[in-house]
Amino acid sequence: MVKVINNFVKVNQYDRPGLKLAAVKGIVMHWTATPGASALNERNYFNGTCIADKRYASAHYFVDRHEAQHIIPDHEVAYHAHDQNRCYVSFLKPNANTTALGVEMCVEKDGTIHEETIRNAAELVADLCKTYGLSADRIVRHYDVTNKGCPTPWVRDAGQLSAFRKRVDSLLGRKTVSVSAASTSQTSSSSGIILKKGMSGSHVKKLQTRLVAAGFSLPKYGADGSYGDETVHAVVSLQKKAGIKADGIYGPSTEKALSAAEASAAGKSKTWTLPDGIYKVKNPLMKGTAVTQIQTALAALYYYPDKGAKNNGIDGYYGMKTANAVKRFQLMYGLGADGIYGPKTKAKMLSLLK
């Protein structure tokens, strides 16, 4: 069993507010995105620099190849999985910070999560599942909750989450139940409203209105409140685009996909301008409108220079926090992760913002 060290950070408004957790309904998996930092390094950061920088962020556990640092008590809130009121996992609503434990996996110097770290995380999470009576389908990614690209390897390959759940079930002596990557069943009425062909009413009409706004047209009948073939076709198109089961049935996983599509459609109304050239940490710091443009685009893609700080760290200065946000973005999209903004990073950002 992984060694768990209770090493709580001091109570403060930024990463350990001392608020009581409403319930433990799930476990949200993260990665630290700080190559080479150990679990203890992370704990010390959140007990010092994070507070000094007035950054709202934390998690309950940090796991590396050797141990797990328990830095926030389980019964308290940690700021790990809430982003501008987004929560796409129904059983964690309305705010995953108040309904879930956060587990961060440390990253090796080469940007990977070591097998021993994953093993330790599985042992920790299995113990937490046993303690709080959770099934493996209550283990989700940060990505599932807010659409943030975390943990990056598990976002690139959702099969890694499935493998992790199976590992946890094996440790608990259970058989794994097949579940979706987002840990929500399209046909489970307990997870939310289910809409399908043949149904009608206000819920259907609202869904149709949202589909049209998100770019999935209903040219013949529009939002008429009847779930017919045209609505099925629009839902299937949405599901295919999101990479989920395309059955034409609206349920929790389709709701998540629709919410993401709505956010994307809203972002398209904005014209994005990003600078040419190279931007990096220099002395004195590079600054000005061009840097603000880079920071604003990063924030729109959920890679905040300093989430929770004033304007989420958008200050017009290309410092270490902006470089770190760029590096996290680069890691997610397979670019050279050096924290330097250049032509390839610009092109990828613009492709995602369009």
Swiss-Prot record:
Q: Which GO terms describe its biological process?
A: cell wall organization; peptidoglycan catabolic process; peptidoglycan turnover
Please state the protein's primary subcellular location.
secreted
SMART domains attached here? Ami_2
The alphabetized UniProt keywords are:
Cell wall biogenesis/degradation, Hydrolase, Secreted, Signal
MF terms (GO), sorted A to Z: N-acetylmuramoyl-L-alanine amidase activity
Asked if the Swiss-Prot or TrEMBL record annotates the protein with the keyword Ribonucleoprotein, the reply is no
Q: Does the keyword Hydrolase apply?
A: yes
Listed under catalytic activity are: Hydrolyzes the link between N-acetylmuramoyl residues and L-amino acid residues in certain cell-wall glycopeptides
The signal peptide annotation in the UniProt record is 1-39
Its localization reads:
Secreted
Which Gene Ontology cellular component terms are annotated?
extracellular region
Q: Gene3D superfamilies this protein is in? A: Peptidoglycan recognition protein-like, PGBD-like superfamily/PGBD
E.C. designation(s): 3.5.1.28
* Residues covered by the N-acetylmuramoyl-L-alanine amidase domain: 40-152
Spell out the PANTHER family in the cross-references. N-ACETYLMURAMOYL-L-ALANINE AMIDASE AMID (PTHR30417:SF1)
Family stated for the protein in its record: Belongs to the N-acetylmuramoyl-L-alanine amidase 2 family.
Indicate what this protein is called per its UniProt record. Answer: Probable N-acetylmuramoyl-L-alanine amidase
Organism of origin: Bacillus licheniformis
